[in-house]
Amino acid sequence: MIASTMDRAEVLRASTGDFPLQEVRVAVGGREWSVLHTDAVLSHADEARFLGDKKDRLPYGVALWPAAIALAHEVASRAGAFRGARVLELGAGTGLPGIVAASLGARVAQTDRQEVAMSVCRRNGERNGVEAIEYRLVDWAEWDDAERYDWILGSDILYGEPAHPHLRRIFESNLAPGGRVLLSDPFRAASLRLLERMEADGWRITMAKWSVGEDEARRAVGLFELAPPADANP
């Protein structure tokens, strides 16, 4: 269930300008979540409009994408696995999956390279009563985190092939023994190519499918769980 509301307009002030924020309420895991975002990109038509509007200077990452909603549902469905777990969210955007994980008792670090995304993540955590989250402004190409995590989360982060080597390095370096990567993706060709290469290299990948949206605007999203090769985390 997804419901938009515009009762109170908010503006995000950042070094790159002012961004009007909308609110949407999303039902996940038996409760309703209030999510601030710059645009809801839920259907194929939404995406074509959003990406095709050359006048739109809004950052892509702070839109609400279907993959984030699907990943939040998947996290909520695995509540026991996230309780007490150390979680890294990559390209957090609006932050919904990590916020849901933190509400279940996970210790969450949300990361993004966009200042505006980190600000929106923090606002969304606070407005939902989830404040015990660490926020880090970081670029994958300059990644220096040596910590190990039980879960690495990412929603629709595989679309850019130049980023694939950086993401693989993070997956390989930052998973704790027995840890898993959990990714959501609307079956983008570039994403599937990376997953196929990783599977060929020994990663064990399982997939589930979620459907996000309503009626004819529903969007299929794949949920991919990645386990490293047996010798990746000795």
Regions from the language model: what does each represent?
Residues 1-234:
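S-adenosylmethionine-dependent methyltransferases
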